[in-house]
C-alpha cells in the first residue's frame, strides 16, 4: 500500500505578484525551489493563511534571490499580494519509505528570505 506523504513545504511564503491573464502556474524564487527540493512543473498544493483557500497548480521558477511568489492564471483569484501561503508537495510512499521519510520544511521570513530549513 502507498500513502501520500508530505515531501516538502515552503512555510509562510508571501505573495508578491498575481497575474490573472498569465496562462497558469505559481512562480517561485529558484533559490527557494532549490532549498525545498521542488522542481519546475511539479504539482503543488497551496494553503492561503489569510483566507483559508486551498488550491493546486504547478511550479515555474522565478529568478533566484528575487523573493518572488507569483500566482498566475486562475490561481491569481485565490490570493492577494501580501497574503501568506503554505506551499506543499506530496509523494506516494510505501510503508518502508514512510518509516524513514523526513519531509523538508523551509521557513520563510520577510521578503521570502529563508530563515531556516528543517527535516522532521
UniProtKB/Swiss-Prot annotation:
TM ranges: none
UniProt subcellular location: Cytoplasm
Annotated protein name in UniProt: Aspartate 1-decarboxylase
Residues holding substrate: 57, 73-75
SUPFAM superfamilies on file: ADC-like
EC number: 4.1.1.11
Record function comment: Catalyzes the pyruvoyl-dependent decarboxylation of aspartate to produce beta-alanine.
